[in-house]
Amino acid sequence: MCGAIVLLLLVGTSPAPVEGLRCRTGEGPSADDVKRIVRTCMNKITNAGTMGEWGQRDRNGEEQQMMRDYGRSHRRRKRQYYGGQTSGSSSSGSAGEHSYNGRASPQYGEAGQGGNGTRSGGNSSSSSSSTIERDRACLMQCFFEEMKATNADGFPEKHKVLHVITKDIREHELREFYVDSIQECFHMLGLDNRLKDKCDYSMRFVTCLSDRFETNCDDWESVTSAMF
């Protein structure tokens, strides 16, 4: 599998493709390589003391559980990040895509944690969910680091990501699709000057790529089913 397929498998999407390309390739890291990188990243986050509930799980199956759990919340995150506005002004272009119920989307780890911790019922559950969301976002950022595709500050870097993801793609049309998708997603994220966190940025980038794959890859469902 090529780099983009690996990243999107970690997101755990369940797409409903409309038409288009055969995006699955036989190149790139194997499933064992993916699991090794995921374990490495989970260990890093655990050792940093930020794994929250993930640190309590059975290590034998946690990487697959992470992928499956992540798919359940993917649709909700897409509504929040890429079309969650419900009121207020929404200018054309990307502004509406980056709104969160009419406000700036929160950084991972901030949602549901109000300034003094006095949010109404469900605050504890919301805080726990937010911690797990944060951990998963940082797992994705670590994945970019392990693929040598980040800049000095740990953010995914466009030219490095382009190289890592497209270097093994030989089919011209498919390669163009990957290049266009990566460039478009970096462009969209560049329009949001609120993105100052490398974990949040990494997950937003992968979510953007996932949207492109859902729309354009008519074999994406077979890719996810093959993984699980």
From Swiss-Prot:
Its main location: secreted. GO terms for cellular component: extracellular region. It holds the Pfam family PBP_GOBP. InterPro entries: Odorant-binding_protein, PBP/GOBP, PBP_GOBP_sf. Keywords: Disulfide bond, Olfaction, Secreted, Sensory transduction, Signal, Transport. Residues 83-99, 121-131 have a biased composition (Low complexity). Residues 50-131 are annotated as: Disordered. Residues 55-72 have a biased composition (Basic and acidic residues). It comes from the Eukaryota. One of its GO terms (biological process) is sensory perception of smell. It is found in: Secreted. Residues 1-20 form the signal peptide. Disulfide bonds join 138-199, 185-208. Residues 111-120 have a biased composition (Gly residues). GO terms for molecular function: odorant binding. Belongs to the PBP/GOBP family. Present in the aqueous fluid surrounding olfactory sensory dendrites and are thought to aid in the capture and transport of hydrophobic odorants into and through this fluid. PANTHER family: ODORANT-BINDING PROTEIN 59A, ODORANT-BINDING PROTEIN 59A-RELATED. This is General odorant-binding protein 71. It comes from Anopheles gambiae. The lineage of its organism: Eukaryota, Metazoa, Ecdysozoa, Arthropoda, Hexapoda.
